[in-house]
Protein backbone atom coordinates (compact mmCIF):
# COMPACT_ATOMS: atom_id res chain seq x y z
CA UNK A 1 0.00 0.00 0.00
CA UNK A 2 2.93 2.36 0.57
CA UNK A 3 3.73 2.43 -3.14
CA UNK A 4 0.31 3.92 -3.90
CA UNK A 5 0.97 6.84 -1.55
CA UNK A 6 1.71 10.10 -3.33
CA UNK A 7 4.91 12.01 -2.72
CA UNK A 8 2.90 14.96 -1.40
CA UNK A 9 1.12 12.77 1.16
CA UNK A 10 4.38 11.16 2.21
CA UNK A 11 6.15 14.46 2.83
CA UNK A 12 3.19 15.75 4.83
CA UNK A 13 3.98 13.29 7.63
CA UNK A 14 7.72 13.92 7.81
CA UNK A 15 8.93 16.15 10.64
CA UNK A 16 12.37 17.71 11.05
CA UNK A 17 13.11 15.00 13.65
CA UNK A 18 12.67 12.37 10.94
CA UNK A 19 15.14 13.94 8.52
CA UNK A 20 18.51 12.17 8.59
CA UNK A 21 21.89 12.34 6.89
CA UNK A 22 22.09 8.54 6.99
CA UNK A 23 19.57 5.76 7.65
CA UNK A 24 20.75 2.16 7.99
CA UNK A 25 18.19 -0.59 7.37
CA UNK A 26 19.33 -3.53 9.48
CA UNK A 27 20.72 -3.57 13.02
CA UNK A 28 23.25 -6.39 12.79
CA UNK A 29 27.05 -6.13 13.24
CA UNK A 30 27.36 -4.33 9.89
CA UNK A 31 24.34 -2.07 10.36
CA UNK A 32 24.69 -0.91 13.94
CA UNK A 33 28.43 -0.30 13.62
CA UNK A 34 27.79 1.75 10.47
CA UNK A 35 25.12 3.86 12.20
CA UNK A 36 27.25 4.46 15.30
CA UNK A 37 30.35 5.40 13.30
CA UNK A 38 28.32 7.78 11.12
CA UNK A 39 27.02 9.51 14.26
CA UNK A 40 30.54 9.73 15.68
CA UNK A 41 31.63 11.47 12.47
CA UNK A 42 28.94 14.11 12.93
CA UNK A 43 26.10 12.77 10.77
CA UNK A 44 22.52 12.63 11.99
CA UNK A 45 22.01 8.86 11.85
CA UNK A 46 19.19 6.36 12.37
CA UNK A 47 18.86 2.59 12.25
CA UNK A 48 15.78 0.53 11.35
CA UNK A 49 15.56 -3.04 12.68
CA UNK A 50 12.57 -5.38 12.33
CA UNK A 51 13.68 -8.14 14.73
CA UNK A 52 12.79 -6.16 17.85
CA UNK A 53 16.34 -6.49 19.18
CA UNK A 54 19.61 -5.14 17.83
CA UNK A 55 22.60 -7.31 16.98
CA UNK A 56 21.28 -9.20 13.97
CA UNK A 57 21.77 -12.92 13.42
CA UNK A 58 25.13 -12.92 15.22
CA UNK A 59 23.93 -11.68 18.61
CA UNK A 60 20.41 -13.14 18.56
CA UNK A 61 20.44 -16.49 16.74
CA UNK A 62 24.02 -17.07 15.62
CA UNK A 63 27.52 -16.71 17.06
CA UNK A 64 26.68 -15.53 20.58
CA UNK A 65 24.02 -18.11 21.55
CA UNK A 66 26.10 -20.82 19.83
CA UNK A 67 29.19 -19.91 21.88
CA UNK A 68 27.13 -19.74 25.07
CA UNK A 69 25.71 -23.25 24.57
CA UNK A 70 29.06 -24.65 23.42
CA UNK A 71 30.74 -23.29 26.55
CA UNK A 72 28.07 -24.75 28.84
CA UNK A 73 28.20 -28.09 27.00
CA UNK A 74 31.98 -28.20 27.32
CA UNK A 75 31.72 -27.59 31.07
CA UNK A 76 29.21 -30.44 31.35
CA UNK A 77 31.52 -32.74 29.39
CA UNK A 78 34.49 -31.84 31.60
CA UNK A 79 32.49 -32.50 34.76
CA UNK A 80 31.39 -35.87 33.35
CA UNK A 81 34.67 -37.09 31.85
CA UNK A 82 37.75 -34.96 32.45
CA UNK A 83 37.43 -34.08 36.15
CA UNK A 84 37.28 -37.71 37.23
CA UNK A 85 40.53 -38.47 35.37
CA UNK A 86 42.19 -35.58 37.21
CA UNK A 87 41.09 -36.83 40.61
CA UNK A 88 38.00 -34.65 40.99
CA UNK A 89 35.09 -37.01 41.57
CA UNK A 90 31.57 -35.62 41.16
CA UNK A 91 28.45 -37.74 41.51
CA UNK A 92 24.94 -37.17 40.22
CA UNK A 93 25.79 -34.75 37.41
CA UNK A 94 22.65 -33.74 35.51
CA UNK A 95 21.97 -31.56 32.52
CA UNK A 96 19.22 -28.96 33.00
CA UNK A 97 18.58 -27.77 29.46
CA UNK A 98 15.93 -25.27 30.60
CA UNK A 99 18.50 -23.46 32.75
CA UNK A 100 21.07 -23.65 29.95
CA UNK A 101 18.65 -21.95 27.55
CA UNK A 102 17.80 -19.34 30.18
CA UNK A 103 21.51 -18.64 30.63
CA UNK A 104 21.93 -18.31 26.87
CA UNK A 105 18.99 -15.87 26.64
CA UNK A 106 20.39 -13.71 29.45
CA UNK A 107 23.71 -13.46 27.60
CA UNK A 108 21.88 -12.33 24.45
CA UNK A 109 19.83 -9.72 26.33
CA UNK A 110 22.91 -8.21 27.98
CA UNK A 111 24.63 -7.75 24.62
CA UNK A 112 21.61 -6.46 22.68
CA UNK A 113 20.87 -3.95 25.45
CA UNK A 114 24.52 -2.96 25.24
CA UNK A 115 24.08 -2.04 21.57
CA UNK A 116 20.97 0.01 22.46
CA UNK A 117 23.05 1.85 25.06
CA UNK A 118 25.68 2.65 22.41
CA UNK A 119 22.91 4.04 20.19
CA UNK A 120 21.77 6.37 22.98
CA UNK A 121 25.33 7.34 23.85
CA UNK A 122 26.11 8.28 20.23
CA UNK A 123 22.66 9.79 19.54
CA UNK A 124 21.61 7.24 16.90
CA UNK A 125 17.82 7.14 16.46
CA UNK A 126 16.47 3.59 16.67
CA UNK A 127 13.29 2.60 14.79
CA UNK A 128 11.81 -0.81 15.68
CA UNK A 129 9.98 -2.03 12.59
CA UNK A 130 10.21 -3.10 8.97
CA UNK A 131 11.76 -0.49 6.70
CA UNK A 132 10.31 -0.16 3.18
CA UNK A 133 11.90 2.07 0.54
CA UNK A 134 9.45 4.52 -1.00
CA UNK A 135 12.04 6.31 -3.12
CA UNK A 136 15.82 6.78 -3.11
CA UNK A 137 15.51 9.13 -0.12
CA UNK A 138 12.25 8.08 1.55
CA UNK A 139 11.56 5.18 3.92
CA UNK A 140 8.38 3.98 5.63
CA UNK A 141 8.81 2.06 8.89
CA UNK A 142 5.99 -0.34 9.76
CA UNK A 143 5.97 -1.16 13.47
CA UNK A 144 4.37 -4.22 15.10
CA UNK A 145 1.51 -2.12 16.52
CA UNK A 146 0.54 -1.06 12.95
CA UNK A 147 2.04 2.38 13.52
CA UNK A 148 3.67 3.89 10.43
CA UNK A 149 6.59 6.31 10.54
CA UNK A 150 7.90 8.18 7.50
CA UNK A 151 11.62 8.96 7.32
CA UNK A 152 13.67 11.03 4.91
CA UNK A 153 17.38 10.30 4.41
CA UNK A 154 20.10 11.85 2.30
CA UNK A 155 21.84 8.47 2.26
CA UNK A 156 20.54 4.93 2.87
CA UNK A 157 22.59 1.84 3.73
CA UNK A 158 20.92 -1.57 3.31
CA UNK A 159 22.41 -4.06 5.78
CA UNK A 160 19.59 -6.57 6.12
CA UNK A 161 21.84 -9.58 6.71
CA UNK A 162 20.73 -13.19 6.48
CA UNK A 163 17.66 -15.30 7.16
CA UNK A 164 16.87 -19.01 7.31
CA UNK A 165 16.36 -20.62 3.89
CA UNK A 166 14.82 -24.03 3.15
CA UNK A 167 16.41 -26.53 0.79
CA UNK A 168 14.42 -27.63 -2.29
CA UNK A 169 11.90 -30.27 -1.21
CA UNK A 170 12.84 -29.95 2.47
CA UNK A 171 10.28 -28.25 4.70
CA UNK A 172 11.73 -26.80 7.90
CA UNK A 173 9.06 -27.44 10.54
CA UNK A 174 11.32 -26.67 13.55
CA UNK A 175 10.32 -30.08 15.00
CA UNK A 176 11.90 -32.94 13.03
CA UNK A 177 13.77 -30.69 10.62
CA UNK A 178 15.11 -27.59 12.33
CA UNK A 179 16.98 -24.51 11.16
CA UNK A 180 20.10 -23.19 12.87
CA UNK A 181 17.75 -20.90 14.80
CA UNK A 182 15.59 -23.80 16.01
CA UNK A 183 18.68 -25.77 17.02
CA UNK A 184 19.49 -23.05 19.55
CA UNK A 185 16.15 -23.51 21.33
CA UNK A 186 15.81 -27.27 21.89
CA UNK A 187 13.74 -28.25 24.94
CA UNK A 188 15.57 -31.60 25.14
CA UNK A 189 18.80 -33.08 23.80
CA UNK A 190 18.17 -35.11 20.59
CA UNK A 191 19.26 -38.76 20.77
CA UNK A 192 20.33 -38.62 17.11
CA UNK A 193 21.12 -35.63 14.94
CA UNK A 194 22.26 -35.22 11.33
CA UNK A 195 23.69 -31.80 10.44
CA UNK A 196 23.73 -30.35 6.93
CA UNK A 197 26.36 -27.61 6.69
CA UNK A 198 29.62 -26.99 8.51
CA UNK A 199 29.37 -23.33 9.48
CA UNK A 200 29.59 -21.95 12.98
Where are the regions a protein language model picked out?
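Short, Lys/Arg-enriched N-terminal segments with co-localized hydrophobic residues
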Residues: 2-15
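Glycine-rich flavin
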Residues: 17-20, 37-43, 49-189
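Beta1/beta-strand and adjacent pyrophosphate-binding region of the FAD-binding site
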Residues: 17-28, 191-199
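The conserved SAM/SAH-binding core of class I Rossmann-like methyltransferase domains
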Residues: 25, 48-49
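N-terminal Rossmann-fold NAD(P) dinucleotide-binding loop
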Residues: 31
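Aromatic/hydrophobic pocket-lining residues that form π-stacking "cages" and hydrophobic walls in ligand
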Residues: 34
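Small side chains
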Residues: 45-46, 194
